[in-house]
Swiss-Prot record:
Keywords noted in UniProt: Activator, Chromosome, Nucleus, Telomere, Transcription, Transcription regulation, tRNA processing
Subcellular location: Nucleus; Chromosome, Telomere
Family according to the record: Belongs to the CGI121/TPRKB family.
Protein name as catalogued: EKC/KEOPS complex subunit CGI121
Gene coding for it: CGI121
InterPro entries membership: CGI121/TPRKB, CGI121/TPRKB_sf
Oligomer status and interactors: Component of the EKC/KEOPS complex composed of at least BUD32, CGI121, GON7, KAE1 and PCC1; the whole complex dimerizes.
Chief location of this protein within or outside the cell: nucleus
GO BP of this protein: tRNA threonylcarbamoyladenosine modification
Record-annotated membrane-spanning stretches: none
Function: Component of the EKC/KEOPS complex that is required for the formation of a threonylcarbamoyl group on adenosine at position 37 (t(6)A37) in tRNAs that read codons beginning with adenine. The complex is probably involved in the transfer of the threonylcarbamoyl moiety of threonylcarbamoyl-AMP (TC-AMP) to the N6 group of A37. CGI121 acts as an allosteric effector that regulates the t(6)A activity of the complex. The EKC/KEOPS complex also promotes both telomere uncapping and telomere elongation. The complex is required for efficient recruitment of transcriptional coactivators.
GO cellular component, one term: cytosol
């Protein structure tokens, strides 16, 4: 099992590696958080990832939209709303116009044993020209950092195992919008509503 690799046609120069780890111990998560804060220049590349908990990510589309919006800001005159591309991804998952709140809700957390890890690589860098080797290296490096099980990221597993619908609907203010008993494609419906809430954030 290796990381899932995606590209957006609008950003051919970037390759996105996405990994899902489950059953990660709280001690391991604490260590990762500590190293993210205290990493020296020599350790920077080792922890140059976006670490997310899985509590409020409803689908892959929800995640991809956040990555896409972050790359759009990164490459345009709009610029980032946060310090870097990694925190921008976290911020763009949130419907709340507060970076600190987004980091708290969506960042890696000891109370969630599952984490999604994202690595964005600029292919214009000659060192990153061989994608297969890069993908294998990303997976190998992450397994050295994370003591958990790497599994496939798929919508059914996300929806059935990670999401607390009551908390999700409360965060995205969807309690009066969606009838859980009448929606045939509930995950798709909630995904679109969550993305809409993020797009309209601050208005």
């Amino acid at each position: 099992m290796t990381s899932e690799v995606i590209k957006f046609p609008q950003f051919p120069e970037f390759t996105i590696h996405i990994s899902l780890f489950i059953n990660v111990s709280s001690e391991n998560i604490t260590t990762i958080k500590s190293n993210l804060i205290s990493a020296t220049d020599n350790d920077h590349n080792k922890y140059d990832y976006c670490f997310l908990n899985t509590k409020y990510i409803i689908s892959k589309e929800h995640l991809f939209q956040s990555i896409y919006k972050s790359l759009l800001n990164y490459t345009s005159k709009l610029g980032l709303s946060t310090r870097n591309l990694k925190s921008e991804i976290i911020y763009n998952l949130s419907p709340i116009n507060n970076v600190g709140d987004a980091l708290k809700r969506f960042g890696i957390s000891e109370d969630c044993p599952n984490c999604i890890v994202i690595k964005i690589i600029n292919n214009n860098n000659k060192e990153n020209s061989e994608e297969t080797k890069i993908s294998e290296k990303v997976t190998t490096d992450l397994k050295e950092i994370i003591d958990g099980e790497l599994i496939e990221l798929n919508d059914q597993y996300i929806f059935e195992n990670f999401i607390d619908l009551a908390k999700f609907r409360k965060l995205y203010k969807l309690n009066d919008v969606v009838d859980l008993n009448k929606e045939d494609n509930l995950q798709g419906r909630l995904t679109r509503l969550a993305i809409g809430a993020c797009i309209l954030r601050g208005y």
